[in-house]
């Protein structure tokens, strides 16, 4: 049981570390929101240089939050695998004892004992199948959270949308996500009206 106990202690330590990383992630999220609020207040005071600095801080906190979250996710995946390994080790030891009991039953010709042993044997096999399936699912779902390309630009655009910074502080807009202007919307409406008029004229 020494190795199993050691493994369980390691699993406990990893779980503790993962929770600590998640707390750090939540802390960074709160700090990010605080920086965004500073951006808003700086704009209200006309302090665009300060607003830019606070916006950069918000982006940095967002990046830190994702890094902590990514590490926590990877640790959780490792813990799931180790936890499965520990359970499989315990089951394997139980199987060894059952095999010995089955051999004893066969040697003595005790049918009742043999039947009881086979019940235990089959139950352990079911447990092993469940654990194996759990491990496969854990491995399939253990891909780390990756920050999508353009994550920073998207967050900067969010700050811009919330506080009207897209022009005043020159924040870049992610490709393909430019906000349509009122003029563009008006042109689209005029074009649609023109096409409808043409269709009516043809009718």
Swiss-Prot record:
> Where is it found, in Gene Ontology cellular component terms?
endosome membrane; mitochondrion
Task: For the region Disordered, give the residue spans.
Answer: 172-203
Q: Where is the composition biased (Basic and acidic residues)?
A: 192-203
From the Swiss-Prot or TrEMBL record, state where the protein is found.
Cytoplasm; Endosome membrane
One short Pfam family name for this protein? Snf7
Classification via Gene3D superfamilies: 6.10.140.1230
* Membrane topology value: Peripheral membrane protein
Instruction: Give the knockout phenotype.
Output: No visible phenotype under normal growth conditions, but double mutants chmp1a and chmp1b show embryo development defect.
Subunit structure and binding partners:
Interacts with CHMP1A and LIP5. Interacts with VPS2.2.
- Name recorded for this polypeptide: ESCRT-related protein CHMP1B
Q: Which organism is it from?
A: Arabidopsis thaliana
Which lineage? Eukaryota, Viridiplantae, Streptophyta, Embryophyta, Tracheophyta
